[in-house]
Amino acid sequence: MKNSKSKFLNFVKKNPLFKNFYYFYNIYIRNYKFLNNGSQFGEEKFILSFFNKAHKGKFVDIGCFHPTRHNNTYKMYKSGWRGINIDLNSLTIDLFNFARPKDININAAISDNEENKTLYFVDELNTQNTLEANHLLFLKNHHNLKNEEISKLKIRTKRLDKILDSYNYNDIDFMNIDVEGHELNILNSIDFLKYKIRFICIEMIDHNDQAKLINEKLNEILERNGYILEKKIDFNFIFKKINYDKKN
């Protein structure tokens, strides 16, 4: 099934006549029910409640997955916000370029160093693709992922600060980080004195002792840099910069 899907997607990408039709089908037909919902558990609605409706904010979404489905910035985009969407899946970025052309959409794997890493790849448009072997254990145990479903690929990582600097993104209203266990590497690469980030939503899953330790470090970094936990929604933790007030 995976090989058939991959062959189909490769065919679509190489044939412009089919490519746009597939993008339209994926967003507006197959995933039509998500066009009004935005985020999966209401994270986006909660974030937007801190801003006046007229505010046109800036966001950064790392591990953006899909432009509409279970996306924490889609309603922001529809409200006039603009941002940078980053994902290591090329098809994801193709869909963003189709559905959200006013955003900056980048195909990249983000980490704390620029180096070659192993990507545990399941499929295009799959939330289970990960750079972390420990997170792969979680996927196998909790999502019944089989070894034969996983391909090991080499991928070159990029640093987030280089991307932010290239687009002059120093003042950010909302940052979403959902990278399947690689969140600590990204947070470690952020200079919180240089980049003003008002809200950070980060996925944290305590699936084993190593993951718990990593999540403790995530909390320590955010607390040390002036953030408090504002709300927990499912596996997503929303942190707010202390002394932040509603913005016009």
Predicted regions and their residues:
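Phosphate/nucleotide-binding beta-alpha loop and adjacent structural elements of enzyme active sites
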Residues: 1-248
